[in-house]
Design a protein with these regions (language model features):
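The canonical Cys-X-X-Cys-His
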Residues: 78-81, 142
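Loop/turn elements at helix/coil->beta-strand transitions in domains of secreted/extracellular proteins
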Residues: 66-71, 96-99, 139, 146-147
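Non-catalytic, surface beta->alpha helical segment in thiol-disulfide oxidoreductase systems
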Residues: 132-201
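Thiol-based oxidoreductase modules, predominantly thioredoxin-like and allied folds used
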Residues: 51-54, 73, 97-121
Length: 201
């Protein structure tokens, strides 16, 4: 009788652990899916299975200083960002870049936070000056980084839209193939998304 009770107790414990484990795996998977879905809701030119992963300003700084991968800085209220992210997704998938680290810079830039200033300092050589003569993150901006070294950046439509009213009009008349070639080279040179710290989680 005691043996039978022990077996029943063991089965119950295993079942409970299985349910907890399944719930954890499902929650983890939902977190990944939610980044993609959330991004596709904010940026309507990407698919629901896009590679964009939300990161904090501190996590982006860590990636830029020590990591490897592709970083995208922008915000959904920017129509030029909306027009750009579809090309980032296309090239990321083509080059097997599974994650594009995303930071919405609107508020930190507006408030000139300490973290924003650090991002500006890291990207200093790749940024343009604003009207006051200070370096500024203009968006959209995509950055390829490997082992904490900036490989290259692209911000083609972030400051000079050459008089075009919309991103669609711009890319219809400008060198879209050239952009794709540049992004493909940048993304390929990152190799793969591997950080030397926890920044790729």
């Amino acid at each position: 009788m005691k043996y039978k009770n022990d077996i029943i107790a063991a089965i119950i414990v295993i079942a409970v652990l299985g349910i907890i484990g399944f719930g954890y795996l499902r929650a983890t998977d939902n977190e990944k899916v939610s980044d993609s879905i959330k991004f596709s809701q904010e940026y309507t030119n990407v698919s629901k299975d896009n590679p964009f992963v939300y990161k904090t300003d501190k996590e982006i700084i860590e990636i830029l200083k020590h990591g490897t991968g592709v970083v995208y800085l922008g915000f959904p209220e920017c129509p030029w960002c909306q027009g750009y992210v579809g090309y980032i997704e296309e090239i990321a998938k083509k080059t097997n870049v599974s994650k594009v680290y995303y930071l919405n810079v609107l508020e930190i830039r507006k408030n000139n936070t300490k973290e924003y200033q650090e991002i500006v300092s890291i990207l200093n050589d790749y940024l343009d000056y604003d009207e006051e003569g200070k370096k500024r993150v203009y968006v959209p901006l995509v950055i390829a980084v490997k082992d904490g070294k900036i490989i290259d950046c692209d911000s083609e439509t972030s400051k000079d839209t050459k008089g075009y009213e919309t991103p669609e009009e711009y890319w219809k008349n400008e060198d879209l193939d050239g952009l794709k070639v540049k992004l493909e080279k940048m993304f390929s040179e990152t190799g793969k998304n591997v950080c030397t710290t926890d920044c790729n989680k």
